[in-house]
Structures are given as structure tokens and as C-alpha cells.
Swiss-Prot record:
Gene3D superfamilies cross-referenced by the UniProt entry: P-loop containing nucleotide triphosphate hydrolases (3.40.50.300)
Highest taxon above the source species: Eukaryota
Cellular compartments annotated: Membrane
Name of the featured protein: GTP-binding protein rho4
Gene Ontology MF terms: GTP binding; GTPase activity; protein kinase binding
Function: Required for cell separation. Involved in the regulation of the septum degradation during cytokinesis and in the organization of F-actin patches and cytoplasmic microtubules.
Gene Ontology cellular component terms for the protein in this record: cell cortex; cell division site; cytoplasmic side of plasma membrane; cytosol; division septum; plasma membrane
Keywords: Cell cycle, Cell division, GTP-binding, Lipoprotein, Membrane, Methylation, Nucleotide-binding, Prenylation
Amino acid sequence: MSAFKKSGSKSETSKKLVVVGDGGCGKTCLLIVFSSGTFPERYVPTVFENYITDITYGPNSKVIELALWDTAGQEEYDRLRPLSYPNSNVILLCFSIDCPASLNNVTEKWYPEVQHFCPRTPIVLVGLKADLRKDRNATEVLRTQGLTPVTYQQAQSVALSMNAPYVECSAKENTGVNEVFQLAVGLTIKKSFSFSKKSCVIL
């Protein structure tokens, strides 16, 4: 595991975010672009990575330290990946828009796994590589297999079945990336507020 942390952090609180999904669907690129603003051109399969960065959230510009936990989607890491789940505040269930099978795996593998290890943790369904939905080469490859890119409506339907919000982005074009994390952080804050209210009622 490696760690990346911005110097001079002025965060008021900290949250842990874990990303899961098929290997090669774009999880690592999403985290790197968000934390550094640079898109990595070379694919390197993830074992486990941990980035720590700050995010400014809300109208009051609250600074939150966000621990970003990357996970490997390959089957050989199925026994190790659960080590990333404890104390998670929010989880991103990721798939690639140019790979319909990766969305199916969200339903068949990733959502059940997350529900098993983190049944009360908020989740966000994230469609990655949105730029490839209209990419000629990508759509042609899918066409030869009798497939088409995942539509927004298809992904939204899956998200609704999991009672989760859905958002799309393109790390390569750096579009929608910040919105993914703003949405995720918002869920952690709502979760904390809800827990506080319940605690007050109990007391």
C-alpha cells in the first residue's frame, strides 16, 4: 500500500472513500485525476493504493480530508480486498460505460460484496469513461460483439434498484470528476447528520 497526502492540510474532518469495480474499468484513473489533475496514459493494474487529499464542500467551503482507497478488481484479490472496507464512510461502485459486462458485474458481484461487508455504508454508482459512449472506435468494437455502450437510463435503473444515486464522468477529459466526489462527500455528511439526530433522540 502506498499513500499520497497533500501538505499543509487545513481539514476540519476526515472521511474514508473506497472505490470498487472490475479491473480496468477506470477506478485508478478517476482517483489520480481527482487528486493530482493528471491523467495517466499507461495502465498499471492496482493491488492496493491509498491517496489522501482535501476537498472543499458546500456553501461554507468546509475543508474535508478525504482518504481515497483504491482496490483491485481482479479475482485473485478477492480475499484481500475486504481489508479495505472497515470504517468506510462512502463507497463508489464503478463500471465502464464502454463495457456493459462491468455494469452487470456491479449487480452480480460488487453490490452483493459491499452489502455483505458494509451494509450501512452509503454507495454511489459511478459510470466511468463517459467519453467513450460516442467514441467511434469504442462503439465499433462493441458493435462487432452485438453490444452498445451503457446508456444513462440503463445505469440509472441499476442505481435505483440499489437505492443509490448515479453519476457519470470522464477522467480522460476531466469532466464530471469533481462532481463525483462532491456527491460522495455529501452522502457522508448526511449520514453523519442523520446518526447525530438519532443519537440525540436516544439520549
